[in-house]
Amino acid sequence: MQRDAMLIQLGYAPNEALINQLEAIEKNTLGYEKIQKHIMDLHDHLKVNNAYVALSNSNNYFKIKIESPTPELALEAHEKVKHFSEKFKVSLKKLQNKETYYIEGFSH
């Protein structure tokens, strides 16, 4: 998938800075080529839970942000993230005291 198309699918208006940021995240994400499609699928599946995949501004990772308005929707979003991680062998890092995960990459 082209970087412009990926940024648009994630809800960004592509520009040079975002393309460079996405490129740095791709290089930092272990086995990125194996999980790219699954990251985009997860983004689509999480929308109904007020959750999404985004570019982290503080680290070169994709982040999964859960902003669900109810505990039930939040729980469902966390379950989807867990399923994604287990099914596609994706290593995640949950941020302490936040509804956020970093996608570290493919874990063999």
Annotate the PLM regions.
Residues 1-108:
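Structured alpha/beta or helical-core interaction and ligand-binding surfaces enriched in interleaved
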